[in-house]
């Protein structure tokens, strides 16, 4: 099944609800909030890198997805914006991994011009294991091809902390 098929029911990017890690809602459209964050941090002298990742957790008949935009300040910690959504769609493990990647790419694509304009490095992180003994590895080639084919830097486990640590914390 093509990955684009997974996004048919995707929420419109402009209607997505985002929040900060402390739970405060982000009232602005996400592109405006990201631009404001970039401006604020660069005005404060920080060089930023952004990592975008998604993780999911099956909870009964629902699957919860969390997508994060992680802002790293070189040598000075970071912060993130979070979006959650739930679906009752049933996925195989491979399909779920590819839906996670598609959700991350959707956000990365919408924001990449901002990152280019402000000279911010960006990576897309996939919660996919590079070890073939893990089931998620079945999606590695497709995920890597999708992310690299879109022109984005790609990270998988164990380097994919945005998805495997940050987004994982949100869904667990």
Predicted regions and their residues:
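Short, low-complexity, polybasic intrinsically disordered segments
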Residues: 129-160
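Acidic helix/loop or adjacent segment enriched in Glu/Asp that either coordinates divalent metal
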Residues: 87-116
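A short acidic (Asp/Glu
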Residues: 61-65, 132-139, 166-167
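Short glycine-rich, basic-tinged beta-strand/loop micro-motifs
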Residues: 119-130
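N-terminal targeting/trafficking signals and adjacent low-complexity tails
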Residues: 13-21, 133-134, 148-149, 172
């Amino acid at each position: 099944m093509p990955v684009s098929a997974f996004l048919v029911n995707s929420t419109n990017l402009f209607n997505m609800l985002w929040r900060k890690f402390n739970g405060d809602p982000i009232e602005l459209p996400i592109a405006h909030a990201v631009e404001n964050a970039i401006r604020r941090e660069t005005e404060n002298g920080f060089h930023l890198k952004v990592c975008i990742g998604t993780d999911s957790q099956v909870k009964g008949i629902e699957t919860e997805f969390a997508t994060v935009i992680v802002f790293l300040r070189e040598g000075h910690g970071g912060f993130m914006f979070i979006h959650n959504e739930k679906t009752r769609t049933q996925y195989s493990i491979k399909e779920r991994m590819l839906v996670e990647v598609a959700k991350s790419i959707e956000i990365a694509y919408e924001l990449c011009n901002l990152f280019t304009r402000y000279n911010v490095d960006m990576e897309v992180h996939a919660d996919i294991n590079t070890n073939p003994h893990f089931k998620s590895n079945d999606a590695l080639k497709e995920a890597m091809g999708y992310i690299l084919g879109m022109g984005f830097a790609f990270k998988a486990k164990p380097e994919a902390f945005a998805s495997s640590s940050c987004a994982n914390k949100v869904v667990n």
